[in-house]
Regions:
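Detector for Asparagine
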Residues: 5-6, 44, 88-91, 100, ...
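Interdomain/boundary linker segments immediately adjacent to catalytic/signaling cores
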Residues: 23-112
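Catalytic core segments in nucleotide and nucleic-acid processing enzymes
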Residues: 116-119, 123-124, 129-228
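Proteins with a high burden of low-complexity, intrinsically disordered sequence enriched in S/T/G/P/A and R
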Residues: 2-9, 34, 43-54, 58, ...
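Terminal, charged accessory segments of proteins
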Residues: 1-37
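Serine/threonine-rich low-complexity intrinsically disordered regions
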Residues: 11-14, 25, 29-31, 50, ...
């Protein structure tokens, strides 16, 4: 039997319906954890994703969740900002201020949402971790493995501790990771940024920062650093 285009689109159509239903529940933007959880829930239901699927294909599903959340966020923007579409701005400053508020909301949401999606992967994989553990000088790494109690217990071997930061892009902010957990000399940084330059990768390596990226992005990096 030949499968028509309409049948192929059933999961995508269901995803759109689920997202519309989610958006209808809110009059304003929900917090990031609610938005991230909603995107995952919509995607997992539409495509019949199980916990076993998440544990088995975390790289692929993480990226699909990120894409799904961006689509969901756009739908929420359409609802919340629709009154502005026909508004007459009195001057350029008023217009740019409004535009900047919209863009800044997007930027501030992205990083925290990535943390929520990573946590969901760890949960599905039954990995023990703790978020936002307070370390030296009130620093707060995004994730400590196994947890803060082990980190602060100096009888617990330091080589069994892992620190992971999550940043959608690295740029200069990756340096924040270096001082976030003194007991852990080798830091890990998860990012969605592709094609980082050789110079920046060398600087990261020299600073004992190890990148963690989705598998499909590895080929965008210089071959010399793909196995680091």
């Amino acid at each position: 039997k030949l499968i028509g285009n309409n049948e192929k689109k059933i999961p995508e159509d269901k995803l759109s319906v689920l997202m519309d239903s989610f958006v209808a529940r809110f009059s304003d933007f929900p917090d990031t954890i609610t938005m991230a959880s909603g995107a995952r829930s919509c995607y997992n239901e539409a495509f019949h994703i199980s916990e076993r699927d998440i544990a088995g294909k975390p790289d692929r599903l993480l990226l699909q969740w990120v894409d799904a959340e961006y689509t969901l966020f756009q739908k929420m923007e359409e609802k919340v900002y629709s009154p502005l579409f026909h508004r007459n701005f009195s001057n350029v400053s008023e217009f740019t201020e409004t535009a900047n508020q919209i863009l800044n909301r997007r930027k501030s949401r992205a990083g925290k949402s990535l943390e929520h999606h990573l946590a969901s992967v760890f949960d599905a994989s039954h990995i023990v971790y703790e978020e936002q553990v307070i370390t030296e000088d009130n620093k707060k790494p995004d994730f400590i493995f196994p947890d803060g109690r082990c980190y602060h217990n100096f009888d617990f071997p330091a080589d069994l501790l892992i620190s992971l930061a999550a940043k959608t892009t690295c740029k200069d902010r990756w340096r924040q990771v270096i001082s976030e957990a003194d007991r852990i000399p080798e830091k890990h940084l998860f990012t969605l940024q592709q094609a980082i330059s050789k110079n920046q990768l060398k600087e990261m390596k020299d600073s004992h920062v190890h990148l963690v990226v989705p598998q499909k992005y590895i080929t965008t990096y210089p071959e010399k650093y793909r196995n680091d």
